[in-house]
Amino acid sequence: MPSTLQVLAKKVLALEHKENDHISREYYYHILKCCGLWWHEAPIILCFNGSKQMMIKTPIFEEGILLNTALMKAVQDNNYELIKLFTEWGANINYGLVSINTEHTRDLCRKLGAKEMLERNEVIQIIFKTLDDTTSSNMILCHELFTNNPLLENVNMGEMRMIIHWKMKNLTDLLLDNNSISEILTKFWYGIAVKYNLKDAIQYFYQRFINFNEWRVTCALSFNNVNDLHKMYITEKVHMNNDEMMNLACSIQDKNFSTIYYCFLLGANINQAMFTSVSNYNVFNIFFCIDLGADAFEEGKALAKQKGYNEIVEILSLDIIYSPNTDFLSKIKPEHISFLLKNFYPKNLYIFDRCKPGLYYP
């Protein structure tokens, strides 16, 4: 194992990627290659994220990937020099057990201190920790490292369900319904990419999984990504009617103002949207539907009573004080929706707050 001084020197070199008047770029790159600080035909850049976690950057991983994730990729590629380098820098060698595909690499990991095999719950923990990094690079890597990984074939689906629900919320049942583990995981990474509008990752999955277009639309509706939804709609990749789209926009999470408004512009039934929001206890969505002209208050109250949602019954009982928001009388262009609704607060929720202070805390 190299000395601490050698390890430190390599870290310093990896951190110092600046133009230097006293040394040519070619010679500097030659030094980096000789020190093993080279990946994907380019220098390895070492940096730290906001949580002070070490990150590795290359032209392929421009946003940076966590050190342990970089180790898993190096193991998958059977890149022995980088396996040793990342371990020297503090990567957990046991992460490498996720992506081993040759006995020679397994032997190297053993020599570097890896255990013989991972427990099922350890594989789940590794996935969970890897998901801390929400970037296009990381979602693509998650797909490459985990989706068709034999270690995931016998994973505890109860534990896997918790991870999926952490990111997918009420889409979890739809995702887990009658799908193979590889399809579940592919849709999972794809769904995260859409949820956080990771454009490079969205394009990566779109090019490879054209049969998952409906899933992409479902995620865009559910997670308020109106820009991606509009992109799919204008290219005729949406095969749902307007009310089906509105149902997803209102049911999965609260404050889905952009996708609700988009479906409203397409002609979806705004009263039905309010009923869906009531059924799912999405209070912001209820008030936004009222802003857009929903007025079926008696039916909404009956549904809320049936569900036992007393607070919503109280909200809908004050229908006399509500009125449509005139700001929406002039239609907003789809490309402007996200910007205009970014910090939006429903007018009728503001009225309700003034009338019944303290009853509901949004």
UniProtKB/Swiss-Prot annotation:
InterPro entries according to UniProt: ASFV_MGF360 (IPR002595)
Keywords from the named record: ANK repeat
Residue windows of the ANK repeats: 66-98
Name of this protein: Protein MGF 360-19R
Job description of the protein: Plays a role in virus cell tropism, and may be required for efficient virus replication in macrophages.
GO biological process: taxis
Family affiliation: Belongs to the asfivirus MGF 360 family.
UniProt KW Signal keyword: no
Disulfide bond residue pairs: none
The organism's place on the tree of life at top rank: Viruses
